[in-house]
Design a protein with these regions (language model features):
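Single conserved hydrophobic/aromatic residue that forms the stacking wall/gate
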Residues: 1-6, 10
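Short, charged/polar "capping" segments at the starts of alpha-helices
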Residues: 35-43
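Active-site/ligand-binding-proximal alpha/beta "capping" segment
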Residues: 167-215, 220
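Short active-site loop/helix that positions an aromatic residue
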Residues: 20-27
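RNA substrate-binding interface of SAM-dependent RNA methyltransferases
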Residues: 84-172
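Alpha-helix capping/helix-boundary segments
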Residues: 18-20, 37-38, 57, 125-126, ...
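Structured adenosyl-cofactor binding patch, chiefly the S-adenosyl-L-methionine
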Residues: 113-114, 128, 132-141, 198-240
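Glycine/small-residue-rich loop that forms an oxyanion/phosphate-binding "nest" at active or ligand-binding sites
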Residues: 50-75
């Protein structure tokens, strides 16, 4: 039987050289490496306590079918919603019930590129520490703040009170390029198949859409998120 890995409620498993070299040292809890990998890449393990394991053991503890030879347990990052919302003119992505690990990973990576201040997610969104998510972030998971919350309706209300303008990605919205994102901004993105729930859509201040040509009705969540945050970034460039 396949192993479920070594992670627990406080720590998560991260694999592969690319991801390993992205982990900030303060989050590293334990490092495992195969002897061959260790001998070949000694320089990346400087000043680290590394447990060497056989290829067989590495295969058993790995989440992938063909492990690269290095695996780390990392302490989970902890951020607070209150701290995130206190930032000046922040830019957020708010995700409701997103299920695809690749989508979430790409959203984090694209979000980092566009300079977002954080990702806020409903509890029924896919686990950000899912190995597929972690891998597809290419290290952004360690640099983009994120929180899971119980109630996105409450978050939308709090944002309104803090003068953060909330936007719902919605088929009945106005063209997203016609809005002004230079103030505090939060883009709400819904589940891949169903979009945002009606309740949350009604709570959010404005509806926006990405115009489509041909017979395409909508883009996937990751691509839509990317277009929205990069439009916000474009508008904010050169603005204090």
């Amino acid at each position: 039987p396949r192993s479920r890995g070594l992670g627990d409620v406080y720590k998560r498993q991260v694999e592969g050289i690319r991801m390993f070299t992205e982990i900030p040292e303060e989050y590293l809890y334990k490092v495992y490496a195969s002897e061959d990998f260790y001998n070949e890449h000694r320089v990346i393990f400087e000043h680290m306590d590394v447990e060497l394991v056989s290829p067989q053991v590495m295969k058993e503890i790995s989440d992938t079918m063909t492990p690269q030879g290095v695996l780390a347990l990392v302490k989970m990052m902890k951020y607070s919603l209150e701290d995130l919302l206190e930032q000046e003119k922040p830019l957020f992505l708010v995700l409701e019930n997103l299920q695809d690990p690749g989508n979430l990973g790409t959203i984090l990576r694209t979000g980092e590129g566009a300079g977002i201040n954080g990702v806020i997610m409903s509890h029924d969104t896919v686990d950000i520490y899912n190995p597929k998510v972690t891998r597809s972030t290419m290290g952004s998971i360690f640099r983009v703040p994120f929180v899971y919350v119980d109630d996105l309706l409450e978050v939308a209300e709090t944002m309104k009170q803090k003068n953060i303008i909330t936007y719902a990605a919605h088929l009945n919205g106005t063209d997203y390029t016609k809005e002004d994102y230079q103030k505090g901004t939060a883009f709400f993105i819904g589940n891949e198949g169903n979009g945002l729930t009606d309740k949350l859509t009604d709570k959010v201040q404005k509806k926006i859409k990405i115009p489509m040509c041909g017979k395409v009705e909508s883009l996937n969540a990751a691509m839509a998120s990317g277009l929205l945050v990069y439009e916000a970034r474009r508008q904010r460039q050169g603005v204090d």
